[in-house]
Amino acid sequence: SDFLIEVDITPNRADACSHYGVARDLYAWLVQNGYETSLHRPSCDSFAVDNEDFPFEVEVVATEGCPRYCALSLTGCEVKESPEWLQDKLRVIGLRPINNIVDITNYVMMAYGQPLHCFDADMVAGKKVVVKTLPEGTPFVTLDGVEHKLSDKDLAICNAEEAMCIAGVFGGKGSGTYETTVNVLLESAYFN
C-alpha cells in the first residue's frame, strides 16, 4: 500500500510544487526534530552525452517570454505503452497515461517540478527550433485535434516552417510523439 498526501502550495513556495520538493521539506522537518533518515538522489553517472549524430539548432527570438530553452535529442527510441508501475503512479496523481515517452516526461515533471515536452524529432523541419510569437490569427492544431487561432502574444515553439507547440500550454498534432516516432527532441524550458 502507499500513501497519498495532498499539499496546498502558497505562491512563495514554488520549490514545493514537486514530489522531490515536498520530500526535501519533510526531510528538513525530520532532521530538525531528531529523526534519523536520509534523502537519496538518483544517479546520472551512466548517462552519456553525445549530440554529434543528431544536432538541432535552437534560437530564442522572444527572450522576454522565454529566458531559457534547452533541448536534447534522443535517437532510436521505441514508443510503446508504459510499464504498469508508471501508469499507476500517473493515475494516482490524476494524469492519464499516453505512452512511455510522454509518460516519463509527466513523471519527471511531477517528481522534480520541471515541465518537459517531447517532439517527434523527425517532424522538426530544418532541424531548427525557434521560440517566437506569430501573427494574430495564425491557425494551430493542438494534440487533441482542435484548431485554434493564435494571438500575437502567444509564445510558440516553431520549427523552420511552422508552430509545433504553444509554449508551456499545449503541443501540436503535427509534431507529437506517437507509436511511429523513433527520434525524440526533449524540451526543457522556462517560460514567463
Model-derived regions: residue spans:
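RNA/tRNA-interacting regions in translation and RNA-turnover enzymes
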Residues: 1-192
